[in-house]
Design a protein with these regions (language model features):
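Solvent-exposed soluble domains appended to multi-pass membrane proteins
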Residues: 1-154
Length: 154
């Protein structure tokens, strides 16, 4: 039943996405549009297919350790009346905190100093954020944002 429901929803999503793109083209003819889709995990039933012998405790540990068999980021970038300016930051592995960099560069927008620094972290860490250097890079970057006054009231 879980797999059937997943496939049903995937089918609905594909139909809805196609209708969404067609509506954008109709309502905004000639306008440049950048669409980004993002996800970061396998469907819940995947655990039974990937390694059915795992109990919930071991599975939870594997997910917490970011085992790529259970936790994998995916994203897609599509332009309508628009060719993405740069996809140089579109790495195979890309944690969610870096997605704004990819979107801004694809849209042809300049990176402000905080995003430029985050891009340097992204390159150093090969697309990982919290899992890079046992979290040290994320802590350092977030500390920079706090000290710059960009993150407040923690």
């Amino acid at each position: 039943p879980e797999v059937d429901e997943y496939l049903r929803r995937q089918s609905m999503s594909a139909v809805d996405y196609k209708a969404f793109v067609e509506r954008l083209k109709k309502e905004l003819p000639g306008e440049p549009i950048l669409i980004v889709r993002f996800g970061d995990h396998q469907p819940s039933f995947a655990k039974h297919m990937v390694d059915p012998a795992l109990d919930d405790t071991v599975l939870a540990r594997r997910i917490a350790e970011a085992d790529p068999r259970f936790l994998a980021t995916y994203y897609a970038i599509e332009g309508i009346n628009f060719k993405p300016a740069s996809l140089s930051s579109a790495l195979d592995t890309l944690d969610a905190p870096y997605l704004p960099i990819v979107v801004m560069e694809a849209a042809g927008l300049p990176l402000d100093p905080s995003f430029a620094e985050q891009k340097r972290v992204m390159k150093r860490c090969n697309g990982l954020f919290y899992r890079c250097a046992a979290g040290a890079e994320a802590k350092r970057f977030n500390r920079l944002l706090i000290e710059a006054g960009l993150i407040k009231r923690l």
